[in-house]
Amino acid sequence: MNLQEIKNAIQNGSNVYWANTGYQVIKDNLDQYLIKHLSGYCIGLTWLDGITLNGKESEFFTI
């Protein structure tokens, strides 16, 4: 999934994951897209440039 596909899926109510179901992509109350681990640890979905994903496109998926 590319960045726009990930954002669209989340906006449409789908659950998006990275690498495995332990890492869910979320949109927080500040409209930031984050990769959140089950432990609560989060990183940004993208690098600071807002374009480059923190992961390969092929590693993002929906269930």
Task: Specify the residue positions occupied by each region the protein language model found.
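Intrinsically disordered, low-complexity, charged/polar segments
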Residues: 42-63
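SH3/SH3-like beta-barrel fold
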Residues: 35-37
